[in-house]
A protein has these predicted regions:
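N-terminal beta1-alpha1-beta2 module of alpha/beta enzyme domains
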Residues: 1-71
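Flexible, glycine-rich active-site loops centered on histidine and acidic residues
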Residues: 2, 6-19, 81-147, 188
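Conserved, mostly hydrophobic/aromatic
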Residues: 5, 33, 37, 45, ...
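Hydrophobic faces of well-ordered beta-strands that scaffold small-molecule active sites
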Residues: 5-9, 41-43, 73-75, 103-107, ...
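Active-site mouth loops of central-metabolism enzymes
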Residues: 9-24, 78-85, 162-172, 279-288
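Acidic (Asp/Glu)-rich catalytic clusters
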Residues: 34-35, 61-69, 96-102, 182-183, ...
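An alpha-helical appendage that flanks or caps ligand/catalytic pockets
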Residues: 125-158, 198-304, 334-336
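A conserved active-site cap/scaffold subdomain adjacent to cofactor or substrate pockets
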Residues: 174-197, 202-203
């Protein structure tokens, strides 16, 4: 079974490094992913979080597009409730004009930060996703020219005027996103790294209820947290740092990503071990043999067309190596030479 692999990058800030380091590491990874044969490179949007550092993926994507040649680029995703659908459409049409047939627009409804930050980003008018379905419908209508006549943007010139369109994706971790994507006839990326329990049911419902739009067919990607290492010992050290991150998040601590050294030096009590055990099913960590086996099982369980790999490791070189090992294991360069 051929497996299509892509990259989701949250631009992590590792302890002891700066935001500038994190952005440079994203550019390094994008170039590597392009060379290795990954299908697409997505950047996530977050606000006010010390561990991740990309509040404006559309800006960073312009740079990534200029540094790469083949790989698709996109948002994973734009947090649409903050913005005008029309403006987001313009931004991604501009990216599509710069990089034809290479752009994905993935949208989500989460705030990408805490509620105080959300209100600051939205100038005090954050709507908590109440109008999100309407906004996604507007994007569909803007891109295919089917906005109703009574819509504010009907007949308004949408620029740049180009023949191609970004590929529109719905991002989600529940049946809400899956069913909305099915209703609108667009692609769906399920965040297994957020919700590992019911994803296969969401995937099944998405396919069953899909309504084709202009000949569209259901297409499902599962976004999975993965760390791949050369040895079990290295994998265990990297997982220790991930465990510390899990505890930090459970306690609501706004901190950089733990380094490998921090993970090695951290002692966990009974409560922390309980948190770690509860969260382990949301990640796949190990050697190439173990990781590929588990990814194949997950792909079959979801009947996924594609796997999108999120790797947040305790060092930037370890992150690069993880993607290298995966690409080798799945022979990506034979798929995308």
């Amino acid at each position: 079974m051929t497996t299509t692999l892509s990259v989701l990058d949250q631009t992590p800030v590792i302890h002891g490094h700066s935001t500038a380091d994190a952005i440079a590491a994203t550019l390094d990874l994008a170039r590597l992913a392009d060379d290795l044969g990954y299908t697409r490179y997505w950047c996530a949007e977050h606000h006010g979080l010390r561990g991740v550092s990309n509040p404006c993926p559309e800006v960073l994507l312009a740079r990534i597009g200029s540094l790469t040649e083949r790989i698709r680029i996109g948002s994973g995703g734009v947090m649409l409730p903050y913005y005008s659908s029309f403006k987001v459409a313009e931004q991604f049409l501009m990216l599509e004009a710069l990089f034809p047939n290479r752009v994905d627009l993935g949208v989500g409804r989460a705030p990408g930060g805490d509620m105080r930050t959300a209100q600051a980003v939205a100038a005090g008018d954050y709507n908590r996703g109440d109008i999100f379905p309407q906004q996604v419908g507007e994007l569909v209508g803007l891109f295919d020219g089917t906005l109703p006549e009574d819509h504010l943007a009907h007949g308004v010139l949408l620029q740049p005027e180009i023949a191609t369109r970004p590929e529109l994706w719905m991002l989600g971790s529940s049946d809400f996103g899956g069913l909305l994507a099915a209703q609108l006839g667009i692609r769906f990326a399920f965040a297994h790294f957020i919700n590992a329990q019911y994803g296969h049911r969401v995937a099944e419902a998405y396919r069953e209820r899909f309504v084709s739009r202009n000949g569209s067919k259901p297409y499902l990607a599962a976004a999975v947290f993965v760390i791949c290492a050369d040895t079990e010992t290295q994998a265990a050290a990297l997982e220790r740092a991930v465990d510390l991150r899990r505890v930090q998040m459970a306690y609501g601590l706004n901190m950089p990503i733990p380094s490998i050294a921090q993970g090695a030096n951290q002692a966990f009590g009974e409560r922390e071990l309980s948190v770690i055990a509860r969260e382990k099913n949301r990640s796949i960590i190990g050697t190439p043999e173990r990781v590929t086996e588990q990814l194949h099982e997950l792909q079959q369980r979801f009947d996924a067309d594609e796997l999108i790999v999120l790797t947040v490791a305790g060092s930037y070189p370890a992150r690069l190596r993880s993607y290298e090992l995966l690409a080798q294991a799945f022979e990506l360069n034979k798929q995308n030479p």
